[in-house]
Amino acid sequence: IYSHFGVADICYVCIGALIPIAVTGGFHIDGFMDTMDAFHSYKPREEKLAILKDSHIGAFAVIMLAAYGLLFMGAFSQIINDKAFIVFCAGFFISRCLSGIAVVSFKSAKSDGLLFMFADTAHRTIVRAALYIQLALCMAVLFIVSLPYAVAMIIAAALSFWYYYVKTKKELGGITGDTAGYFVCICECAMAVALGGVSFII
């Protein structure tokens, strides 16, 4: 579509990468940066949790955000097929469904904070079931749109979800509000890479 209107590739990539940030106000990016600072501090668990509360930006947050941006934009530049783009857009819904599932399923690293409050008061079974149903319906539609792209993206999302569980449990003993944003970012980037790879191959 973008090529039909004569939009340059670099413009397509930059605007495409900016839209999710503009829509959310960079809320998830903030969590990603805080989490990167904590993970790359290589300090004891308690100090990592303290770093998550620190409003200052560390060097590793900036470095990893730059790396993330380059990887995401590079992958997005390969998504030039209309069906791949449709599947890519659905990825934002999938990442948030999985993030919600994690909130009501994974252990919280702290006994305070917004995430703990939400998880503690939520009707876990009902919320989890609702999210799984929405996720299943979304995947069913994607299978109809394009089986190869849908399979690639779902595998990437599942691997991201598994990595998120293992990494946060090892580093922090559970998840926090910041790591929820971190997960959304890595999940969306992984899905973009998967779709970009499949687009390049086929």
Where are these regions (language model features)?
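Acidic (Asp/Glu-rich) catalytic motifs at the cytosolic membrane interface
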Residues: 19-57, 165-187
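Alpha-helical transmembrane segments of multipass membrane proteins
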Residues: 16, 20, 24, 72, ...
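C-terminal membrane-associated helical module and adjoining short loops/tails
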Residues: 108-115, 120-202
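Multi-pass membrane catalytic core of lipid/isoprenoid biosynthesis enzymes
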Residues: 38-83, 87-88, 126-142, 184-202
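Membrane-water interface of transmembrane alpha-helices
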Residues: 26-36, 98-109
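Transmembrane helix-loop junction
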Residues: 3-4, 25, 38, 54, ...
